[in-house]
Regions:
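Thiamine diphosphate
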Residues: 1-128
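Conserved thiamine diphosphate
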Residues: 119-144
Length: 144
């Protein structure tokens, strides 16, 4: 048995199956970006024996744009986000889905803050993306 948390499990799969990982820290998905950055910094290879390129951007919108650009060039790319960060990625999500480019946005679902800061978990951020054309695969628990 391997003991791990959801962020570590998600980061492991993303690092092994990607060539480009665009990151920008936002709670609660920050540990995923930190882990893949550390692993690439230590030259840990993906499944194809190459070290994924990790690019930290100035915003979530920049991370989504980086993923879009990498996909356009034929790279396997992914990112990590939640809450308001996911909302900033929506314009690029429409383009990525419309161009039928394969990617994964790993989302740690969190309440979209309205009148006050909120760190509670719900699916309001994910539900805001329903019309983008992205296929959504969701787990019922961290273990799944």
């Amino acid at each position: 048995m391997i003991t791990t948390d959801g962020n570590s499990a998600c980061a492991t799969i993303a690092h092994k199956l990607s060539e480009v990982l665009a990151i920008y820290p936002i709670t609660p998905s920050s540990p995923m970006g930190d882990l893949v950055d550390t692993w690439s910094g230590k030259s840990r290879p993906n499944l194809w024996g190459a070290v994924p390129q990790v690019i930290e951007m100035q915003s979530e919108a920049g991370a989504a744009g980086t993923v879009h650009g990498a996909l356009q060039r034929g790279a396997l790319a992914a990112t990590f986000t939640s809450s308001q960060g996911l909302l900033l990625m929506i314009p690029n999500m429409y383009k990525i889905a419309g161009e039928l480019l394969p990617t994964v946005f790993h989302v740690a679902a969190r309440t979209v803050a309205t009148h006050a800061l909120s760190i509670f978990g719900d699916h309001s951020d994910v539900m805001a993306c329903r019309s983008t054309g992205f296929a959504m695969l969701c787990a019922n628990s961290v273990q799944e």
